[in-house]
A protein has these predicted regions:
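Membrane-interface "cap" regions at the ends of multi-pass membrane proteins
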Residues: 1-39, 43-48, 62-67, 78-79
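TM-loop-TM module centered on a large, flexible mid-protein loop between adjacent transmembrane helices
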Residues: 84-85, 91, 124-142, 231-251, ...
Length: 455
C-alpha cells in the first residue's frame, strides 16, 4: 500500500532529505531529559544495575516502536503521523482523541517542559535568569490539595499539593524561546530544518563530550567498584519502595516493580518524540525510503548514546549520594540563594547521581571532570540541546493540527498554509497554548502531565 502522493498535492513542498529527517528524529528525542532524569530514577530504584535495566528496556521499546512506525510511514507518506495512522487503522474518532490529547497535553506540554528545562540550565550561568528561587518574580500564596482515600489507609493520601503560585524569569524566557522559534518556522520549512540540523549536530557533540569525559578523562575506578558492589542490593530498600509498600499493602518485590515502572516515566520522556518525524511525511523527499530509514537510524543512534551516557555517569559519580548532605545544602541555598553555586561547589562526588544539584547529573559529571569550565561548558551544551529540541517539536507537531483541520476535527483556520507552504495558523495556536502551559507548573509537573497523557 505504497500510495506515494505527487509532490505538492497537499500544498507542502518536499524539501526534507534523509539527513534532515534523521536529525529530526534525533533532535526531537534528545532534549534535557538524558541530562536530568537519571537522578530521579536512581532515587526510585537505588542500584546502578536497575538503572541501566530501565534504560535498556526504554531502548528496546523505542527501537521496536521505531520499526513499527517505519512500516506505517512507508505505507502512508503524508502529513499527519500518529493521527493519520489511527484514523486509517480504526476510525476518525481515535484520530480525534489522539489529536486533541496531543494538542492539550502531549505535544504542547513537551514544548513547554523542554523550554522550561532550557532555563534550568541557563540558571547555571546566571541564576537570576533560571527557574530557581533567585529568579522568582512573583509568588502568590495558594492552597491546593488533592487527597486520595485508599480503602486500607486510615487517612487520605495527598497526591498533589501546592502552597504557592510563582512566576519566574525563566518562565518568561521559555515563553520567549517558543515565540522566537515559532516565528522562524513560519518563514518556511527550509529555515526551520536548517536550525534543526545545526542544533542537533551540536547537541550530539555535547552528549558525546559527556561520554568521553566520563568513560575516559574522569573515570574513577573506586566509584566504579562501589557502583558494581551496590548494583542490585539496595533495590527494595529505597524510600519510595517503602512508601509504596505502606500505601498499597504490596510485598517488597511487587512494590519495587511498581516503583521501577513509575521510574521509567523519566527515561520514556527522554526517548519520547521519535515518531514526530512522521508528521512531516508530506515534506520528505522519497518518503517511502527516507521515512523508515530515518526512524531506524535516529532511534538506534540516540538509544546507544543514552546507554553510554549513563555508563559515563556511573563511572564518575556514585549512584547513591549523601541524602543528609543534600538536604543540608538545599536548606542553606534557600537561606542564601545568591550563593547557591558556592554552596554546592566541590560536593558533586558526595551528592552522587541520586542527590545531584537540581538533578543536573550531566553538569555534575563535567564539574568533576573539569572543575570550573566543565560545569559551564555542560550547561551551554544542554542549552543548545534543549533549544534544538524545542525547534524540532515546533516544526513537526504543527503538521498534526493541520491534518486534523483538513478533516474537520480541529479549528478550520489551522488547515491553511501561508505563502511559504507552512501551516502558520497551526504554528501560532500551538505556541499560544504551549506558553499557557509554561506558566501552569514546574518542569517535573509538566513532565508528569506529558507522560501520563502519552501512556
Amino acid at each position: 500500500m505504497n500510495c506515494q502522493p505527487a509532490p505538492g498535492d497537499d500544498g507542502f513542498h518536499r524539501r526534507i532529505g534523509l539527513f534532515t529527517a534523521t536529525m529530526l528524529v534525533a533532535g526531537n528525542m534528545v532534549g534535557s531529559g538524558i541530562f536530568i532524569v537519571s537522578s530521579d530514577m536512581s532515587r526510585d530504584v537505588g542500584g546502578g544495575g536497575w538503572l541501566l535495566v530501565l534504560w535498556l528496556l526504554t531502548g528496546l521499546m523505542t527501537v521496536l516502536g521505531g520499526l513499527c512506525y517505519a512500516e506505517l510511514a512507508g505505507a502512508f507518506p503524508k502529513a499527519g503521523g500518529q493521527y493519520l495512522f489511527l484514523k486509517e487503522a480504526f476510525s476518525p474518532l481515535w484520530g480525534f482523541l489522539y489529536g486533541w490529547s496531543a494538542f492539550t497535553v502531549i505535544q504542547c506540554g513537551s514544548i513547554a517542559a523542554v523550554a522550561v528545562a532550557f532555563t534550568k540550565f541557563l540558571g547555571v550561568l546566571w541564576p537570576v535568569l533560571g527557574a530557581g528561587a533567585e529568579a522568582t518574580l512573583l509568588k502568590v500564596p495558594m492552597e491546593v490539595s488533592v487527597p486520595l482515600q485508599l480503602p486500607w489507609m486510615p487517612e487520605p493520601v495527598i497526591i498533589f499539593e501546592r502552597h504557592f503560585y510563582t512566576i519566574s524569569t525563566g518562565q518568561l524566557i521559555a515563553a520567549g524561546i517558543i515565540v522566537l522559534l515559532t516565528f522562524v518556522n513560519c518563514l518556511g520549512v527550509a529555515r526551520g530544518a536548517l536550525v534543526q540540523n545545526v542544533f542537533t549536530v551540536a547537541k550530539l557533540l555535547a552528549l558525546s563530550l559527556v561520554i568521553v569525559m566520563g568513560l575516559g578523562v574522569a573515570i574513577d575506578w573506586a566509584v566504579v567498584r562501589q557502583n558494581l558492589d551496590g548494583a542490585w542490593v539496595p533495590a527494595i530498600e529505597t524510600t519510595r519502595v517503602s512508601r509504596t509498600m505502606m500505601l498499597t499493602d504490596l510485598g517488597p518485590h511487587m512494590a519495587f516493580a511498581l516503583v521501577a515502572g513509575a521510574a521509567m516515566v523519566g527515561s520514556l520522556f527522554s526517548a519520547d518524540a521519535w515518531a514526530n518525524v512522521t508528521l512531516t511525511a508530506g515534506e520528505v523527499k522519497n518518503p517511502g525510503r527516507n521515512m523508515p530509514l530515518s526512524l531506524v537510524l535516529g532511534t538506534c543512534m540516540v538509544i546507544a548514546l543514552y546507554v553510554l551516557c549513563n555508563l559515563a555517569y556511573m563511572a564518575v559519580l556514585p549512584v547513591t549520594g549523601n541524602e543528609a548532605l543534600a538536604s543540608q545544602l538545599r536548606e542553606q541555598a534557600e537561606r542564601e540563594p545568591g550563593r547557591t553555586a558556592a554552596i554546592y561547589s566541590g560536593h558533586a562526588k558526595e551528592l552522587g547521581i541520586s542527590q545531584a544539584q537540581d538533578d543536573r547529573v550531566g553538569t555534575a559529571v563535567m564539574d568533576v571532570a573539569s572543575p570550573g569550565w566543565g560545569r559551564v561548558a555542560m550547561a551551554c551544551g544542554i542549552m543548545v540541546s534543549t533549544f534544538g529540541c524545542v525547534n524540532g517539536m515546533i516544526l513537526v507537531t504543527a503538521r498534526l493540527y493541520w491534518a486534523m483541520a483538513r478533516d474537520g476535527l480541529f479549528f478550520r483556520v489551522a488547515g491553511t498554509l501561508n505563502s511559504r507552504g507552512v501551516p502558520q495558523a497551526s504554528l501560532i495556536m500551538q505556541a499560544v497554548w504551549s506558553i499557557v502551559l509554561v506558566f501552569s507548573g514546574t518542569y517535573s509537573e509538566l513532565l508528569d502531565y506529558v507522560i501520563f497523557a502519552s501512556l
